[in-house]
Amino acid sequence: MKTYSLLFLILSFPLCIFAQTRAITDTGQEVMLNSDGTYTYVNKEEAAAVNIPTNSTEFSKSESASFLLKSKRVNVGFWLDPKLWSFGEPQDNPDAEYEVALKGEDLYGVIITEKIEVPLETMKNIALQNARQIAPDVHVVKQEYRMVNGQKVLYLELFGTMDGMKIAYAGYFFSNSSGTVQFITFTSQNLLEEYREHSQQLINGLVSLS
């Protein structure tokens, strides 16, 4: 999959680019997206119906993740196994801080950081709205809050199609006072289960350094 760099575009938009834009959530609720990253339900009664579950498992970095890749923009780092993963600054995606790839395989990742803090509860809908500008059929197949290395994150699995390619995304969304992080892996939908263990081990390397 040599064209993998093109796929970064689907989720590489900054999270905070909307000013009073109407959007439809993946569960059908209409919301107003505000410039500060918050949103308001058009129908107030629908707000109570939205519930993202919390996974009771505590996730932590793999013992084999021996290298700490530090963000230069926000106070976070990413533990990874350099024997398995190649990584570096992006060549074709100015919104990403780092790109990663499983050596010799078709699993890729992107780390997008911003200095703006965004409420964790708003990230899913904003990310979906951004992604649908390029892949209108992007939808959530799994969502939950997790505790990862002591920090609460939002975990999303998304399916979408771009240029006929069926892509699966799995990653963490995290924000603190230093900014916001999207740590996302992706591959083709038919390879998601084959690469699930590697994908989860990679994103579980996310740590707060503040």
PLM feature segments, named:
Residues 20-99, 116, 137, 176-178, ...:
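N-terminal targeting sequences that direct proteins away from the cytosol to non-cytosolic compartments
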Residues 94-96, 128-176:
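Signature of long, low-cysteine stretches enriched in small and polar/charged residues
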Residues 12-18:
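N-terminal signal peptide c-region/cleavage motif recognized by signal peptidases
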Residues 1-8:
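Positively charged n-region of N-terminal signal peptides that target proteins for export
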Residues 118-122, 165, 195-196:
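Solvent-exposed, non-transmembrane alpha-helical starts
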Residues 25-27, 102-104, 160-162:
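Short acidic, glycine-rich loop/turn motifs
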Residues 96-125, 181:
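A short acidic-to-branched-hydrophobic micro-motif
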